Amino acid sequence: MVREELVKGYENFREAAAKLSEDKNAKLYVYFIGERNANGENWCKDCNEAEPVFAQAIQEYADKDSIILRVEVGNMLAWADKENPFHKDSDLRLEEIPTLIRWKTAIHLHGDQCKQIKLLELLFKEEDIEKITER
């Protein structure tokens, strides 16, 4: 069964990613999104639009040994700050959300790509996404 975890903020992300990547039998996917408010609403419009497609892709295509680490990058002001550690981290260099990364690989989707079920399927199946996203 796919395991899903949610963390908020950069330090919590780093800690969770380090811990979860210790499981060598699991495939770790990190999904960066905007922060949700108390009502569960995300300030990021693209994140809201991608959510149902992403949920469907997890259900249909993710291996049962997958781990989905959802990371809330902060509120709109925090995300816009050029000093935000998610922007400055040399491993991430996040420029837009949502972004989905197959952890410890170059395989990733960002922005509108996270709304495309076919691209999500390819990512979870680890096929050559680069050829498709360059079109």
Give the location of each predicted region.
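Thiol-based oxidoreductase modules, predominantly thioredoxin-like and allied folds used
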Residues: 6-8, 58-83
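Short, surface-exposed loop/helix-turn segments at secondary-structure junctions
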Residues: 43-47, 79-85
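Short catalytic/ligand-binding loop motif for oxyanion handling, primarily in non-cytosolic enzymes
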Residues: 38-40, 78, 108-110
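Non-catalytic, surface beta->alpha helical segment in thiol-disulfide oxidoreductase systems
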Residues: 90-135
